[in-house]
Every structure is written in C-alpha cells, then in structure tokens.
C-alpha cells in the first residue's frame, strides 16, 4: 500500500512539473509575442487594415554643364477611389467624367469595383493642376489625390535623341533617361490610411506618412547655349539641302568632354509615339557608321609626319589625276590632277594620290597600327547607348590596294564619335582621350555621388607632330578646301570630307555624305566640331561647300559662349575669284554715335533711337559681314 502511494506521488510530481514547464513556455511565448515581436506583428496587423496613397518623389533633373535644367518635372496628380467610403458611384461618375474628359461608363466600371482602393487610370492619371483643383472643390468622399509627376522638357526637342524619354510609369525608355534610370528614379513617399474590413476609417489609428527620397540629378558636359546653335544650323541645313539626315558633335579636344551632340530629324520627347522608333533609338553621332572620306586623311597625315616620311614644305609631289596600285586606277577628285605640289598643298587640296603616296611611305602594317592607336575599330568608351565599333580591314586582308584607299578615307567604316576622338588626339598634343557626356551625379541631399574626370588612354603621336598637324589644317582653312570655315580674328583649322555612299556592296552614283571637322583656336584648340550631312541635294555636293560653312558658323558663335580668344596673327585667307570678301563686325557699343558717323566703312549703317552713345548693335561684334551689308546701331543715353 505504501509502495502504491509513493508511486502515485511520483507521478503527481511529474504532472505538476509538466504543467509548470508548459506554463513557463506560455509565459515565454507571451513575452516574445508581446515584447520582442510587438512591432513586427503590429505592422502585419496594420497591413490588413491599411491602404497606401502613393506620393511619387521627383525624378532627378538633367542639367547642362552650367546647371541649366534641360529635363525636369511637372506636378501631375493621380486619382484613387475607395468604394467602401462612398457607395454613390453613379453620382461620382457624373461629376468626374466631364472633368476628366473621359467616357462615363468606362469610369463607372472602375468606380464600381469592390477593391479596397482603385487607381483611376488612365482617366485620372497625371491630371493637370487645374483639374486637380477642380477635383478638390468637389469634396467627393472616398476620392483621394496622390502626388505624381511627368517629365518636362523646357527646351522642347533640343537634345532629344540624346536625352530620350520616360513612359507611362515614369520609367526611362530611351537615351539618358533609360541608361541612367536607376540613378534618376527616386523612392516614393506614401500616406497609409487605416480602415476596417468595410473600408471605414479607424479613428483610433492615425494615418501615417512614409518619407521617400528624390532621384539624383545628372549634370551633363554639354552647354545648352552651344547646343542651340548646333541644332539651329543642322535644321537649316536639312531644309536648305533636303537632306535625309544630319549630325553634329562638338568636343573639348583637351579633355574629351562632349559640348554638343545632335541628330536630325529630331522629335518631341513628350509625343515620342508619333515618330518611328528609328528616330529616337538612334543617336547618330555614336550609332551611324560610314566611310569617312577625306576627314580620315588627318590620320594618314599624322602618321606620315610622326614617321618622318614627308617634308610638308620642302618636298614636291606630282599629281596627274590618278595613281596605279596593282593594276587598279585610283583617281583624284580633281580629274585633271593638281600637278606639282608641296605636301602641304597636297593637304590643302585634299589630293587623293598625294595621300596614297603618304600611306605607301608609311607602310601597310604601320598605317593599320596607327589607325588602331587612334581608336578606330573599337568603341570609344563614351557609355552612350547604341555606340557602334565600325569596320576595319583585318591585317591579312590589308593589301596594297586596301592600304591605298584607306589612306584617303575609303574602304573603312567608322562612327562620327571615333573620328572626333581621333582628330582630338591629332591636334591636342597627341593624347587620345575617352569622350564622355556625364559630368556629375548629385544626390537629392546635395551630395556628389559621382564625378567624371578626363581619362587619357594613350599617347599616339608626339607634341611636335601634333603642332605640325594643326598648322597644316589651319592652312587648309586659309588656303585650301576648307576656306568657307575661315573666320576673321579666329584661328580655325579643319578638313573637308566627301564620301560616296555604299548600298549592297556598291557605291551609289551621286549619293554622298559630306562632312567637315574643324577646331579653334588652331594654335591651342578648345573646341572641335564635326558636322555631316547625309544625301544633300545641291549642284555642288562637297564638304567644302556644304558643311565647312556650318562648322565655321558654329565655331564663330562658340567664341562668345566659351570665351575663345581672338587673334591678329592668323594666316591670311587666300581669296580666289568668286569668293565673297567679309570682315568681322566691330564692337560699337559704348562709342559716341557722332564719332562713328565721321568714319567711312565698307558696309552701310542704319541708325535707330536717340542719344549720345551706342547701346546695342546688330549683328553682334565678331560676326562676319559682307561688303555693302546693312548693319544696325541703336542710340541711347
């Protein structure tokens, strides 16, 4: 009996211990849930009650090098409807449909949904500020307005093929907007509304605000003032010559900073749906590949001087209009030939046989090596979307004929940005720089997230060779085929290009891409400008007559924008019969009108206003004016 009692007592202890352990476990669990998991479980509970009204944070701006906004944002709210808070959807539809200019029945279908929160899109997405104010005045229960933005392009079509655009959900779809979408996109804010199962507001739980963060600003290397000049000139060329397309690229040859970049035709980023994808998907200065023509001769010239195989001023070359290479007759653009010339005159006249001779003296292997050193056959590293690599001959396929045609820019395929990168190296002292367009990325808090600096790839030619190349190309503008780029007071150097277009492996008769690449000041270049016009319709289709004047005008106007120095020791222009004689417009502002009236000028003056001093003038100082042209001077006190 005693044994049975002890056995029962032992079992009772075990049961009591088990109950105590179970109770302790419950206490521990309660502590864990009530204290340790309090915030987590509260958030889970709130998730069943809350509905978020998103407030989009602003997408980052895109600015030029001077901080001028070229892409920004415009407030465009979006409407949300909570059906549980307003059952009178018929009346809501009657009020909203005319205001939103949408079909009442389609809107009613959205308003009638049993979802806790319905986004009224597309009808109520990105409404105008005026519409938002009208909605606010209606005081409709259950209707909420969420902050939203759309992209705003204050300069319209300017830079559109570089910048790209955003889509319906503010995501970048092309250009810079696409390439740097993650940088530009911010993290949105939101209001959390707490409701019961029926959608009624829970008054004991206050609404919450979740703060987001705006996107970063991207500062480009371009100057919007120069960009406006470039795009104006391209637009005029397109209209004047009924061209298929045109492009331009301006760069600081000492750093690789892209100062302007343009492609025509252009488009409005806010209505991109109206144009073909080939317009907004192709940034021509990096995408387009073609035979460069005579602008490529700068590479041959640089290699020939570096290898010391020519003497520009003291050595003569005879051009009979063609030269024979392994049975192939390679002609000069001037059928009758240029006759006896120095090699400097070969450069001035853009004489094909003369450049073939330079290439022959350099040698095929070395010429091909220089072409690669100058960056051809590979992407420049600009990080611009859609950049092509171009096409070069392989070493095995680079025979005497291929070497000869390459020497004057035929038979190879390059991009405009490759040409600009290479010519920059030829004139800046011999250093090949990586072109770049993004200067800085700046966070919404003002912190600089990234800052790009000039990146030198390699030394291609010596400073002495580069100086001789600059001098030769300045002579091209003063005395040779580039004379239409000449500007009094500005030392301009450059080279023309006229390349026959290729289709299905054959050259097309009468169809050309004409180009000109120019720089200033010629003794210390600060800007390099390349312009190409595709299939211009004109009697004289040459880079010398079509694109050289365009580049000259861009460089002339860039002088005041970039502060280029004027010089009195430039090479004098060699005038020939038929050339228009021009001179630079003086700076009359601040002078006394009576003193100016006493002088004699080759142009006519038209006076405006009253006063003692000249307060304004047209054209601006430095602009080229013709003899007998009318200028306008404005008097004031």
Predicted features along the sequence, with ranges:
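Soluble non-cytosolic domains of exported or imported proteins
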Residues: 57, 86-91, 122-129, 170-174, ...
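Beta-lactam-recognizing serine transpeptidase/beta-lactamase-like catalytic domain environment
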Residues: 71, 196-207, 248-294, 299-533
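BRCT (BRCA1 C-terminal) domain core and associated BRCT-interaction motifs
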Residues: 605-625
């Amino acid at each position: 009996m005693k044994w049975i009692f002890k056995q029962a007592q032992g079992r009772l202890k075990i049961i009591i211990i088990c109950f105590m352990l179970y109770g302790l476990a419950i206490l521990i669990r309660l502590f864990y849930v009530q204290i340790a998991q309090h915030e987590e479980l509260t958030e889970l509970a709130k998730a069943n009650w809350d509905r978020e009204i998103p407030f989009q944070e602003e997408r980052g701006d895109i600015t030029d090098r001077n901080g001028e906004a070229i892409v920004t944002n415009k407030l465009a709210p979006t409407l949300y409807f909570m059906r549980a808070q307003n059952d009178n959807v018929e009346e809501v539809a009657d009020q909203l449909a005319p205001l939103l200019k949408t079909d009442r029945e389609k809107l009613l279908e959205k308003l009638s949904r049993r979802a806790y929160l319905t986004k009224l899109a597309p009808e109520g997405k990105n409404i105008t500020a005026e519409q938002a104010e009208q909605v606010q005045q209606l005081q409709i229960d259950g209707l909420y307005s969420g902050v939203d933005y759309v992209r705003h392009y204050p300069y319209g079509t300017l830079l559109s093929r570089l910048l790209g655009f955003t889509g319906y959900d503010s995501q970048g779809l092309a250009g810079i907007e696409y390439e740097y979408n993650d940088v530009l996109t911010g993290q949105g804010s939101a209001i959390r509304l707490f409701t019961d199962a029926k959608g009624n507001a829970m008054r004991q739980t206050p609404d919450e605000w979740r703060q987001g963060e705006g996107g970063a600003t991207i500062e480009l290397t371009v100057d919007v003032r120069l960009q406006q000049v470039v795009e104006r000139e391209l637009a005029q060329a397109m209209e004047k010559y009924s061209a298929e397309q045109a492009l331009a690229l301006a760069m600081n040859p000492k750093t690789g900073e892209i100062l302007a970049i343009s492609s025509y035709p252009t488009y409005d980023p806010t209505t991109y749906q109206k144009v073909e994808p080939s317009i907004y998907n192709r940034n021509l200065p990096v995408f387009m590949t073609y035979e460069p023509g005579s602008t490529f001769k700068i590479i041959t010239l640089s290699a020939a001087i570096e290898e010391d195989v020519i003497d520009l001023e003291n050595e003569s070359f005879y051009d009979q209009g063609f030269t024979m290479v392994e049975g192939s007759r390679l002609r000069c653009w001037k059928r009758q030939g240029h006759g006896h010339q120095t090699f400097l005159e070969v450069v001035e006249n853009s004489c094909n046989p003369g450049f073939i001779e330079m290439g022959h003296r350099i040698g095929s292997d070395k010429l091909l090596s220089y072409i690669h050193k100058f960056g051809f056959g590979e992407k420049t590293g600009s990080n611009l979307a859609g950049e092509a690599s171009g096409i070069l001959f392989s070493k095995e396929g680079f025979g005497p004929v291929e070497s000869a045609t390459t020497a004057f820019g035929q038979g190879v395929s390059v991009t405009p940005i490759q040409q600009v990168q290479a010519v920059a190296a030829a004139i800046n002292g011999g250093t090949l720089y990586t072109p770049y367009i993004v200067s800085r990325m700046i966070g919404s808090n003002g912190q600089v997230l990234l800052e790009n600096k000039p990146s030198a790839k390699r030394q291609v030619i010596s400073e002495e060779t580069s100086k001789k190349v600059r001098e030769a190309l300045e002579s091209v503008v003063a005395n040779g085929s580039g004379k239409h780029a000449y500007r009094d007071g500005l030392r301009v150097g450059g080279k023309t290009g006229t390349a026959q277009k290729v289709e299905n492996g054959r050259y097309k008769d009468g169809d050309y891409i004409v180009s000109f690449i120019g720089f200033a000041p010629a003794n210390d270049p600060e800007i390099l400008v390349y312009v190409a016009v595709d299939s211009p319709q004109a009697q004289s289709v040459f880079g010398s007559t079509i694109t050289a004047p365009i580049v000259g005008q861009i460089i002339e106007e860039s002088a005041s924008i970039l502060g280029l120095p004027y010089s009195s020791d430039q090479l004098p222009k060699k005038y020939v019969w038929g050339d228009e004689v021009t001179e630079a417009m003086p700076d009359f502002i601040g002078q006394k009108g009576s003193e100016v009236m006493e002088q004699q000028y080759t142009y006519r003056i038209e006076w405006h206003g009253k006063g003692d001093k000249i307060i304004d003038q047209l054209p601006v100082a430095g602009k080229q004016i013709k003899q007998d042209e009318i200028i306008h001077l404005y008097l004031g006190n």
